[in-house]
């Protein structure tokens, strides 16, 4: 759930957040996974208290900490998706009462909530925000924390569509077209078929 477009009827689209994967990753799976790795490395170096993230990440890595770097930077299997795959450990460790996981969780929810505070200036009253993405779908506690961090006038609603649907809708808006219910139905059916037969 990284903001992309603010749509106010009769006005041009405005952008908040969504500045790309090199700059604007606040609260994303990549950022949570990266921060989990950072805290695990810090703990094993003795730069902070121990965190359960060390054991959880070591179990997922399948190798001891001194071999993590080669997996993270592997040109074939490492990189951003690999790093994002560690995000779920934040939620596991947080459920165990881990201090580092709680900090990562809180910071991510706050960064996503901030987007709604920036968007609020464009609306006179309540405004809807579609919540989407693997983290808010699979971890309802994260969605709830984002809701709490959001602007009081932001109506946070589950999207019910894959994130790519929002990109398609935005593309139509960019060319002055209005996506209606038929577009949504056709898009979601085509997407479902594509998922069955990649």
Language-model-derived ranges and their functions:
Residues 13, 29-37, 50-54:
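Hydrophobic, well-ordered secondary-structure segments
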Residues 5-9:
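Short beta-strand-to-turn element immediately C-terminal to the catalytic PLP-Schiff-base lysine
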Residues 25-34, 160-164:
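Short, charged, low-complexity patches
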Residues 20-28, 74-78:
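A short glycine-threonine-serine/GTX helix/turn-capping micro-motif
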Residues 38-198:
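ATP-binding/phosphotransfer module of carbohydrate and carboxylate kinases, centering on a glycine-rich
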Residues 10-18, 22:
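A short alpha->loop->secondary-structure connector
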Residues 1-2:
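Short, small-residue-biased leader/transition segments that mark boundaries at the very start
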